[in-house]
Amino acid sequence: MKKITTFKQKFIDTHGRERIFNGVNLCDKGYNGEEERIYEMPFNEELIKKLSQNGFNLVRLGMTWDAIEPEPFKYNEEYLDKVEKVADLCEKYGIYFYLDMHQDLYAGFKGMDGDGAPKWACLTDGAKFQKTRFVWAEGYFWGKATQRAFDNFWNNAEYNGIPLQTYFCKMWQHVAERFKDHPALFGFDMFNEPFPGTDGGKVFRKLVGSVVKTVLTDKRCNLVWMAKQVLTGNAIRALEPFNDPDLFRKVTSAGNGLIYKFDVGAYSQFINRTARAIRNVTDNGIMIMENSYYSNLGIPYSAPVINYDGVREEKVCFAPHAYDLMVDTPAYKYASNSRVGSIFDQHRKSQQRLDVPVIVGEWGGQSEGTDWLFHINFLLDKFDKNHWSQTYWAYYDGLLENPIMSSLNRTTPVAICGDIVEYTTDRENGIFTLEFEQDKDYDVPSEVFIHKAFASIECTADYELEAVDGTEASILKINGKPGNNKVTVKF
């Protein structure tokens, strides 16, 4: 497999082709056993093969600190063997992987929601983790144990006389040592959705106050109408005023100051420290920066690009996340394209500031039926417009038979010689188009994944087709010439 690196806002391979990745999350958060959390990395060859056949060429391979280092400096090699087995399967079927150190609510123990850190690394200053009562994320909002555990992690408090982040960095070095030369390695996603700790609780309270103030004072909010919707059982409709991106940003801006402080302070210091630790082991792999939990709502991400004493990391990308407020509920059919679109517009501004490529690390979610797929298609079109790669959240048993696959299994550019100008999908008329500017002659073709049988191909250059075994899909290989090249696939 070709090594992937970065150039400005593009992913490129060793031939200099622009690469686009259509991916999915495979995340092992573990589950509660009788005494301890159990981790299995339960992704087999049949699954990886099917992912490849469905056009997925990247997986975000999620694991946790707890799974890897259950005791200080004692690493679970048996578990890492399981991770490596999945990585080997990815290579076999032409799929890249990047390693995600996942967490939700900092950690999770018996009977508790959450995942991430081992119990010994949870320094809560005496606060106790509480069971969830309403929504899984409430520990972020008012859970003192979760908030204090994050505070102590970001402040690099000591356990047994050693700073927590020293343990974390050495754990990452151990992982990097094992995977540094793997042919399918894409990169290192060092920390999932970093949360600011006690300041995160303050942000939540500021956002609640901002909602109340906006509803009471902004003329765009008809309080009588909104109250009527709630009283008549249409509470979801009461949120419609916040489909207005300007109004939504007005509410979320209440948290801007505290998130800026976190991004440029504790998080930036942490990500630089962790990336440097990995780079002391290997120059391979792309360093992946994530936004904080609250930037999933569109609060600006302000961390500078990863650097070492002012020297910029050469291989780095930005991996933003965002979801609609209705995600993973029966009300997902009421998802707001304009609201989530504005969040990704803010992420686009962050990309331009950082001048790095983007892979949307998490997006999408799930619901019942098909009347929410308009939102999935909207997001895919937005990513395509920005030439963004993405990893859908997340794989579960039955995903590949779910109606959402009519959106996720799609025709996409894979490796393009030169610069992509534009690629679009017209779902109504069944037309995919690609335009690219080839800067020189290449000794390899441009490649496009065609997801099913097609009616015709129009191309300004010679091309060949390579069948994808066991499917109606094919790889379109275009022998482009310097200058403008166009492709149209009709279904």
Task: State the predicted function of each range.
Residues 315-323, 329, 340-407:
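Substrate-binding cleft of secreted/luminal carbohydrate-active enzymes
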Residues 6-22, 26-285, 291-295:
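Active-site mouth of glycoside hydrolases
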Residues 6-9, 42-48, 293-309, 340-348, ...:
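Alpha-helical scaffolding within the catalytic cores
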Residues 372-459:
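Extended, alpha-helix-rich binding/interface surfaces that flank or overlap catalytic cores
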Residues 48-53, 179-180, 304-314, 348-355, ...:
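Acidic (Asp/Glu)-rich catalytic clusters
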Residues 462-473:
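Solvent-exposed beta-strand/loop surfaces of large extracellular or lumenal domains
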Residues 226-254, 305-336:
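Aromatic- and acid-rich polysaccharide-binding/catalytic face
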Residues 476-491:
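Surface-exposed interaction regions enriched in Ser/Thr/Asp/Glu
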